[in-house]
Each structure stands twice: as C-alpha cells, then as structure tokens.
C-alpha cells in the first residue's frame, strides 16, 4: 500500500515518486489549475509543502511515520504548469528521531527548502483499526462511538448496532461536529439498510431529523441514498466519505498553517479537532499542523458554554499532543484582543452559504465582531462538504434550539433557579463581511467566492 493511502494524503496533489533509495527520495509535482492561489496563476505554497513532505516520508521509509516541517522557506514563486522536483535526504538518524533536508527545484532554480523531523512513529492504520484520536470506528456490523459527553474524565465507547441508536447518539450529542455527524450518519444508514434491512426512506428521514443545522449530515445522507439508488455498495460509500473527510482535513491543515505566524497566539472556539471529524480536524487541524510545522504557537481555548466543548474536548486533544494552551471563559476573548494577546482566530463551520455566511457554534458571531473591532484576522476552516450552495444567505438557515436545562445545569449540578427559563440557541450566523478567509482543502477563499471551491 502507498504510504499516502495509509495516512490519508491526496495522491494526485502530493506528486509522483521518481527515485527512492535508502535515506533518499525524489518526487515530481506537476502543478495544475486546481492548485492556483490567485488570479495571477501562482501555485499555493501548500502544494509544494505537501510534495516536500511526501518526499521526506519516502526518504525515511517507515509505514507509520509523521513528520513536521521547520525552517521552511519558499524562495521563488511557482506558476500553474511548472514541474517541480523535490529532493529529500535523511541528514540525521537517531533511531526514531530523524532529520530530513528537502530542496525543491524548478529546473535549476531552487523554489523551496526546509527541514522535516519525525515527530512520532505510531501504529496508525486507515479504515482500521487504531488511530491516535478518533471519535468512531466501523466494525462491519456495528459502529463504535466515543461518547464525547463523558470526556475529558472518562473515555466511554458506545456500541451501536441499529440506526435508531445512531440517531439517538447524534441527537443527544454523544457525537458532535458537522463532519463527524455526517460520517456517523452514513454508517447509521448502512446499519439501517444493509444490516437491519429497514426501509431506506425511513432510515434516511430518521437520521436526517436529528440535527437541523449541520449541513454535512444532509450531504452525507443524500450521497448514501444516491449510492443506494445507483446500485453501489453503501458500506464502501460510507467508508469513502470517512476517508475523504480525513484527507480533506490533512490538506486544510497544510494549507491553513501557512497563514499562522511564527510564535502566534491563536484563539479557537468550540471543538474542531479530530473528535469533530474523521480525524485531524478543521480549525484545530490547522492549529495542529502549525504546531507540528514548528510554528511555536500558543492556543487560547474558549470554554464554549453551555456544553463546554472547548474546555472539555479541545483542551483534551491539546493535552494529548502537548500543544501549549490555556482555557478562557468565553467573555475573556475581547479583553485579550484589546491587550494585543491574540494574533488570529480560527473557527470551524456547521454550514456555509453560497455568499459566504457561516453557521457555527453560538458565540462565533461575537468573536467575529470583536475581531473586526480589534483588527484581528478571523478565519473559518471547513471542508467543501460543509458548503451548501443551495442556500444564498445565512438568514435561510434553521438555527437549532436545544433544551433550556442544558444552560441551567452544568456537570450535573443546577446553576440557576429552577423557576428561571433559559434560551439555548446552539448556533449563530456570522456574515461574510466579518470573515477574513475560508480555509478548505481546495485552498483559502474570500467568503464571497466560496462556491469556487466546489468547482472541479
């Protein structure tokens, strides 16, 4: 198996091996239209970095290697149509700790140079069997789901054998995060139709009606129904949805990490990491890639009331990977910006409209307004599967309203008078004009041009 398939890396966009020897590798990258960064035809640096990363993987020649780039320099611009050769050589070898020097050339001109280090060598299998942080595993006739309501103090796995159990888990937020919900629903469809032999329309409607805002849910179920009608193997289709999401997250991480300055203090909201996706993450995936890329970042983690996805889940992921961070109350963010203690904000998305409005966890709009007031860049990271081109404006999005009890009770303890009512909106809408850019696996787009990310 190609190492890129093993790790969920896009094979077409990371180049083709032309020479592999012990401790050395060369990769040829033929640039194409989809790699454009702007109207001038320049190639986004993330694709050069991806080819360099792949060359370093081949040079190290370990099936389960993960590398981090450091001292990276983009020396000359690359245009669509240019052919780039990336040459990687292992310069230091101390067992599991290796250093790889990579240089990329356009003809005789050096366009990129950098160092790559093995961060960890782990048993990481695709469709498999084991992964560092992963919210679910498909086991053929059942879905194993990490119950995120129990984190960070307990790691409890639910064994779901029916589509009704999957629907309940989605509705009650045992799983959350738009991409993870989409993947989970796809496997729920497999359980209902293939394992339980239930009516497909009934299964579809039950799963669809669990959460009204997350577009990945509808996107995944529509794709599963289409696959069924076309006579495809729906189990393989669900696996493909999972694989594509992980691959998209890795690309987003590579592309998005370029906008993160060295020594940056990054603020993020809710949980947008591996727990919210098929692995790696969207906004937190960008942060993760910047960390492993040697950016020496620090993360401010919004606690994200009332469900505390930031304090419970994002912090849990950051602790697991030793990424420096501090948890803050949601109301602290504005003061930190005023004091110059936030360099940029990166959040995820549950739905993106055709004009670039974004539905995301409640509190996102507040952060965007604060960023505009304090001149702090505000980025959204999401896969193209989150873009709903059928909806033009955020005003058309249904905002989920959840139980008031989730506001009045925290950690099992009542924190408000039982006679008091509460309003619990799960999401808000951030208008396109407040967003600096939207990071996708296809590149970084201005909000008003986001539908271009859907073009082949």
UniProtKB/Swiss-Prot annotation:
The keyword ATP-binding does not apply. Keywords: Amino-acid biosynthesis, Isomerase, Methionine biosynthesis. GO terms for molecular function: S-methyl-5-thioribose-1-phosphate isomerase activity. The active site is at 350 (proton donor). Pathway: Amino-acid biosynthesis; L-methionine biosynthesis via salvage pathway; L-methionine from S-methyl-5-thio-alpha-D-ribose 1-phosphate: step 1/6. Residues 124-456 are annotated as: MTR-1-P isomerase. SUPFAM superfamilies: NagB/RpiA/CoA transferase-like (SSF100950), Thioesterase/thiol ester dehydrase-isomerase (SSF54637). Its EC number is 5.3.1.23. It catalyses: 5-(methylsulfanyl)-alpha-D-ribose 1-phosphate = 5-(methylsulfanyl)-D-ribulose 1-phosphate. Residues 40-113 are annotated as: Thioesterase. It holds the Pfam family IF-2B. The record marks 270 as: Transition state stabilizer. It is an enzyme of class 5 (isomerase). One of its GO terms (biological process) is L-methionine salvage from methylthioadenosine. It comes from the Bacteria. Substrate binds at residues 176-178, 211, 309, 360-361. Transmembrane segments: none annotated. InterPro entries: HotDog_dom_sf, IF-2B-related, IF-M1Pi, IF_2B-like_C, Initiation_fac_2B_a/b/d, M1Pi_N, NagB/RpiA_transferase-like, Thioestr_dom. The keyword Isomerase applies. Belongs to the eIF-2B alpha/beta/delta subunits family. MtnA subfamily. NCBIfam families: eIF-2B_rel (TIGR00524), PRK05720.1 (NF004326), salvage_mtnA (TIGR00512). Catalyzes the interconversion of methylthioribose-1-phosphate (MTR-1-P) into methylthioribulose-1-phosphate (MTRu-1-P). This is Methylthioribose-1-phosphate isomerase.
